[in-house]
From Swiss-Prot:
One family name in Pfam for this protein: AhpC-TSA
Phenotype of the disrupted gene, per the record: Reduced size, egg production and brood size. Survival in response to heat and oxidative stress induced by peroxides is comparable to wild-type. RNAi-mediated knockdown increases lifespan in response to the heavy metal arsenite. RNAi-mediated knockdown increases expression of gcs-1 and further increases gcs-1 expression in response to the heavy metal arsenite. RNAi-mediated knockdown increases the expression of isoform a of skn-1 in intestinal nuclei.
Name by which UniProt lists this protein: Peroxiredoxin prdx-2
Gene from which this protein is expressed: prdx-2
Substrates-to-products reaction catalysed: a hydroperoxide + [thioredoxin]-dithiol = an alcohol + [thioredoxin]-disulfide + H2O
Keywords: Antioxidant, Cytoplasm, Disulfide bond, Oxidoreductase, Peroxidase, Redox-active center
Length: 201
């Protein structure tokens, strides 16, 4: 059996695969749909398993900075193939003992693996998700896809920067060069117009 993800329905610039599933939100079991967040940016990130080692560092990092994402009209959703019962038990475990503690983001349960499969991150032989991260715009089109192998976590700073960059482009019509951060120079798309940037840099 292949170890690689297959049957992905997730493509840049195309509508993000829709889903509806249970999640743990503020300590309760709640039905969550992607369509609930139309009109907002969505950062959807998958992680392999509850009660592991790299995963809590990522989930806690995103949760602790949820207000920064909220301030730019963005929601963050975490997802794995574990059940909501497993999620809740992990959330209820103190951070100093490897738990998540109080969460400021929904934690989704993809128990039938359909969401992970649709997004192309399912490790079929183990039934767990690779570390996929997807940025979805307010029209629910996919703008960014990153998939890490299991051992390496992701950067909240870089995710926040990417959302800010997509929002800047949509608002101003200019494009963002490598390493762009809010307040730094952008490029006017066009052969002549772009020279303004290149002359300065």
């Amino acid at each position: 059996m292949s170890l690689a993800p297959k049957m992905s329905k997730a493509f840049i610039g195309k509508p993000a695969p829709q889903f509806k599933t249970q999640a743990v939100v503020d300590g309760e079991f709640v039905d969550v749909s992607l369509s609930d967040y139309k009109g907002k940016y969505v950062v959807l990130f998958f992680y392999p398993l509850d009660f592991t080692f790299v995963c809590p560092t990522e989930i806690i990092a995103f949760s602790d900075r949820a207000e920064e994402f909220k301030a730019i009209n963005t929601v963050v959703l975490a997802a794995s193939t574990d059940s909501v019962f497993s999620h809740l038990a992990w959330i209820n475990q103190p951070r100093k003992h490897g738990g998540l503690g109080e969460m400021n983001i929904p934690v989704l349960a993809d128990t039938n693996h359909q969401i992970s499969r649709d997004y192309g991150v399912l490790k079929e032989d183990e039934g767990i998700a690779f570390r996929g991260l997807f940025i979805i715009d307010p029209s629910q089109n996919l703008r960014q896809i990153t998939i890490n192998d299991l051992p390496v976590g992701r950067s909240v700073d870089e995710t926040l920067r990417l959302v800010q960059a997509f929002q800047f482009v949509e608002k101003h019509g200019e494009v963002c060069p490598a390493g762009w951060t809010p307040g730094s120079d952008t490029i006017k798309p066009g052969v002549k117009e772009s020279q303004e940037y290149f002359k300065k840099h």
